[in-house]
């Protein structure tokens, strides 16, 4: 009779500013010299690095010795094969959780804030000392989670893009984006600064700013609501272009279609990560909807010791 595998914990982090400086300049003294020439000091950057390192060490100590664990950098996410029952511990800023979310299929994510003086902690609300209890809750199936909606884009060539906050359609440069946009009420040809499609998680950022500029024209969704919002930025009312379909809500199973009319420079990217962009050139069709894949973000379980 085979024994069940111990739970596997995947600890995800991104390089610190200090690590990137050392990588770029080779040594601490060379990095310090470079910063001093820019009128800056390395001390504060180094102290932030130490705080994050202390948090990572504390998290590792919270993992039971008999459990499996893997350390992962953000840059390695696209090459890593997650297991169905992995428990992910994201140690870093809120954006790290968004980076991780698009590679998951319902695994639990524990967000740990290594530096509350620097990071807001909306998606990383836990301190390192809470991790042992949270891991036990997850392994026992009693953890309380927020099931956050994600936005999904499927291209007609089969490519798929997921994002936790928002997805941008537009031109790589500052040129206008040209495309046709289609919703249930009809289709319209547009020239604009691009289209933003946001979840409830992303509704506190870019979408909120656009919505405020338009006097709160849409009731933005909450993070767990299976609804996404779209906004067209600066639609141009020129000959052959329309400006009627510039905002809206897409509820469960409702779709938005965008057909590119850009010969060069058309792109789609999620959560502000332009290096992960997908080309969106003339004739390509993108279908956007609230994804069936959701982020399972762990909160404290009722009756726990936290």
Task: Specify the residue positions occupied by each region the protein language model found.
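Short hydrophobic segments within beta-strands
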Residues: 12-14, 198
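Short glycine/serine/threonine-rich phosphate/pyrophosphate-binding segments
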Residues: 96-101, 203-208
């Amino acid at each position: 009779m085979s024994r069940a595998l111990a739970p596997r914990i995947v600890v995800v982090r991104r390089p610190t500013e200090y690590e990137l400086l050392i990588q770029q300049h080779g040594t601490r003294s060379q990095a310090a010299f470079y910063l001093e020439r820019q009128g800056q000091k390395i001390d504060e950057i180094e102290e932030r690095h130490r705080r994050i390192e202390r948090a990572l060490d504390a998290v590792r100590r919270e993992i039971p010795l008999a459990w499996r664990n893997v350390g992962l950098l953000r840059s390695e996410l696209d090459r890593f094969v997650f297991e169905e029952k992995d428990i992910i511990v994201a140690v870093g800023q809120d954006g790290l959780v968004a980076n991780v979310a698009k590679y998951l299929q319902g695994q639990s994510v524990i967000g740990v804030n290594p530096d509350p003086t620097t990071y807001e902690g909306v998606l990383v609300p836990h301190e390192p000392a809470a991790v042992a209890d949270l891991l036990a809750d997850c392994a026992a199936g009693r953890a309380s989670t927020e099931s956050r909606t994600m936005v999904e884009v499927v291209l007609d060539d089969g490519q798929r893009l997921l994002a936790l906050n928002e997805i941008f359609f537009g031109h790589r440069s500052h040129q206008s984006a040209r495309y046709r946009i289609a919703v249930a009420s009809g289709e319209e040809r547009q020239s604009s600064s691009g289209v933003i499609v946001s979840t409830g998680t992303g509704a506190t950022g870019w979408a909120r700013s656009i919505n405020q500029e338009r006097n709160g024209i849409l009731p933005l969704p909450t993070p767990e609501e299976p609804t996404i919002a779209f906004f067209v930025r600066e639609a141009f009312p020129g000959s052959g272009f329309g400006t009627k379909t510039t905002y809206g809500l897409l509820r469960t199973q409702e779709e938005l279609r965008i057909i590119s009319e850009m010969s060069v420079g058309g792109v789609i990217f999620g959560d502000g990560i332009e290096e992960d962009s997908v080309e969106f050139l003339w004739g390509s069709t993108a279908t956007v909807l609230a994804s069936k894949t959701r982020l399972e973000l762990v909160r404290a379980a009722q009756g726990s010791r936290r």
